């Protein structure tokens, strides 16, 4: 990928000038000036997803100038490089090929001259056979009983993606009960194991190296718990499978190498749910539905690869994000799913975005002089409305929001879904258009409030509006549409990283704390006071040793 400082481009300078013209304009005015604004600023993907970005502080000219920035930073070349297996993860000298994992067209994708698709397809076929065995009851535990519960032990991308997707696709789940353990805090695994029967529980240990501290600590605890009942360590092979490439350590643990599912170093953890890491998803919803998840992502991949930037949904959403973070000074963005099944979607995107683009040096290794990754957060609606929407509506910070909702609910009970979606539509309208003090005064007086009190209350009850949102409607949450939605955000994140001249596919920021923790671990044993760190860390460690 080229190494272009976006702030030095002519497109960036044009956007700076354009911002001065746009900044004072209210969204209310933009709609009044163009009755067809929504039609012009909406895109539909495969009759599955509709994205309305009309309630933003931008014009057609803004989009044109943002697209010029994408062109000047050579986004098109970067996209082609990723899809063709170029080693765009330069600091680790690796390609970035999560797109190969869902390459349903089976086009050859080369890494160092070798087509990776036969490897990908072989692992998928192995996953398919295993899932059918477990789901149909042909895979029995040591006592001859079938499996009823599956515990996924992983962390980061080995947990967030599978957990999010199994929750989102609960309407498609079978009889298997899914559990996820990630935190090294013993409470996590202890509470999970309390209600489980060792003879009917299958553990998935997800660690590429099979050395990840948190994952292997939890896996060893699970193994000890299992053997208290099973007794014979040979039984581990029927109750533990691995998602790993370290066959030696997998075998040492007691797992049959035949029950280890491979993935590759060109798959980043936060982009790995499409790989063997997605085994818990496939076990939960069945392999046919897992393939539909891959199909939805593949269709979005093709849209991203082949669609002109003017109609390219991931590119447009990425550019809008840059518009707010780098010109309006927005520091956070909220993802607000109006569907309880998507309750873990913001947490999943939080890792995908912040671990990818939370970088302080550019692709030349020099400190950037501009913002990179935004802080991403969110909660399901309508819960959030009774928690933090106050600040979004009337606070002093600009917080761009993505509102996400399905048109068709999987649980059409009474008028629940109509009330939910009424709130969805109302919130984006209120954020965009607000309510003036004059409108508040007139309403209050119409309700019988005296003029003096109405004047007093008006500033507190007024809404400035002009708060930006994107509305993303899914026809329904299905494996196909969820796959497309996840891939949409993946490509949005990639696009922003390209334009901002940073590497989105490494994560060196997680290493220092892990290394320090490894050294501190041995210091927590014994009565000796610790004095080898800074005064604060020494004091905290010594307090722990005193109270423990």
UniProtKB/Swiss-Prot annotation:
Biological processes annotated in GO: gluconeogenesis; glucose 6-phosphate metabolic process; glycolytic process
Listed GO MF terms: carbohydrate derivative binding; glucose-6-phosphate isomerase activity; monosaccharide binding
Pfam families in UniProt: PGI
Family to which the UniProt record says this protein belongs: Belongs to the GPI family.
Lineage: Bacteria, Pseudomonadati, Pseudomonadota, Gammaproteobacteria, Enterobacterales
GO terms for cellular component: cytosol
Subcellular location per the Swiss-Prot or TrEMBL entry: Cytoplasm
Pathway linked to the protein: Carbohydrate biosynthesis; gluconeogenesis; Carbohydrate degradation; glycolysis; D-glyceraldehyde 3-phosphate and glycerone phosphate from D-glucose: step 2/4
Enzyme Commission no: 5.3.1.9
Organism whose genome encodes this protein: Hamiltonella defensa subsp. Acyrthosiphon pisum (strain 5AT)
Entry-linked InterPro entries: G6P_Isomerase (IPR001672), G6P_Isomerase_C (IPR023096), Phosphoglucose_isomerase_CS (IPR018189), SIS_dom_sf (IPR046348), SIS_PGI_1 (IPR035476), SIS_PGI_2 (IPR035482)
Protein name, entry field: Glucose-6-phosphate isomerase
Gene3D superfamilies: 1.10.1390.10, Glucose-6-phosphate isomerase like protein, domain 1 (3.40.50.10490)
């Amino acid at each position: 990928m080229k190494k272009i400082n976006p702030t030095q481009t002519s497109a960036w300078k044009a956007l700076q000038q354009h911002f001065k013209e746009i900044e004072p304009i209210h969204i209310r005015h933009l709609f009044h000036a163009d009755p067809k604004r929504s039609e012009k600023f909406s895109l539909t993907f495969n009759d599955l997803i509709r994205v309305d970005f009309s309630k933003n502080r931008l014009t057609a000219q803004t989009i044109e100038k943002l697209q010029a920035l994408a062109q000047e930073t050579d986004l098109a070349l970067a996209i082609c490089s990723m899809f063709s297996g170029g080693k765009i993860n330069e600091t680790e000298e690796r390609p970035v090929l999560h797109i190969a994992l869902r390459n349903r067209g089976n086009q050859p994708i080369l890494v160092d001259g070798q087509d990776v698709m036969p490897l990908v397809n072989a692992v998928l076929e192995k996953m398919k056979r295993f899932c059918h065995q477990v789901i149909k009851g042909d895979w029995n535990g040591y006592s001859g009983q079938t499996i009823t519960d599956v515990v996924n032990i992983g962390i980061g991308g080995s947990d967030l993606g599978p957990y999010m997707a199994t929750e989102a696709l609960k309407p498609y789940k079978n009889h298997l009960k899914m559990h996820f353990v990630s935190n090294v805090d013993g409470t996590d695994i202890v509470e999970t194991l309390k209600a489980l029967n060792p003879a009917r529980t299958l553990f998935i240990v997800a660690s590429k190296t099979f050395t990840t501290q948190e994952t292997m600590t939890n896996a060893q605890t699970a193994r000890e718990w299992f053997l208290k009942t099973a007794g014979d360590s040979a039984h581990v092979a029927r109750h533990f499978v691995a998602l790993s490439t370290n066959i030696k350590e997998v075998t040492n643990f007691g797992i049959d190498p035949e029950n280890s599912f491979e993935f590759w170093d060109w798959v980043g953890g936060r982009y790995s749910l499409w790989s063997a890491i997605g085994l818990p998803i496939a076990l939960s919803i069945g392999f046919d539905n897992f393939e539909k998840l891959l199909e939805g992502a593949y269709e979005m991949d093709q849209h991203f690869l082949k669609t002109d930037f003017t109609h390219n949904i991931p590119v447009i959403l990425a550019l809008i994000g840059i518009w707010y973070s780098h010109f309006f000074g927005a520091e956070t963005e909220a993802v607000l799913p109006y569907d309880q099944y998507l309750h873990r979607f913001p947490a999943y995107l939080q890792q995908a975005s912040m671990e990818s683009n939370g970088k302080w040096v550019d692709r030349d290794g020099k400190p950037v002089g501009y913002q990179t990754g935004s802080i991403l957060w969110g909660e399901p609606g309508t819960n959030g409305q009774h928690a933090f929407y106050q600040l979004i509506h009337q606070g002093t910070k600009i917080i761009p929001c993505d509102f996400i909702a399905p048109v068709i609910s999987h649980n059409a009970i009474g008028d629940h879904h109509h009330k939910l979606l009424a709130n969805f539509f109302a919130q984006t309208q209120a954020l965009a258009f607000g309510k003036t003090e004059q409108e508040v005064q007139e309403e209050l007086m119409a309700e019988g409030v005296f003029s003096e009190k109405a004047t007093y209350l008006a500033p507190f009850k007024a809404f400035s509006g002009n708060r930006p949102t994107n509305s993303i409607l899914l026809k329904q949450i299905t494996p196909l549409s969820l796959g497309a939605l996840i891939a949409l955000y993946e490509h949005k994140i990639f696009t922003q990283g390209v334009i901002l001249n940073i590497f989105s596919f490494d994560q060196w920021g997680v290493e220092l704390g892990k290394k320090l923790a490894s050294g501190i671990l041995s210091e927590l044993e014994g009565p000796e006071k610790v004095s080898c760190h800074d005064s604060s860390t020494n004091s905290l460690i010594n307090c722990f040793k005193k109270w423990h």
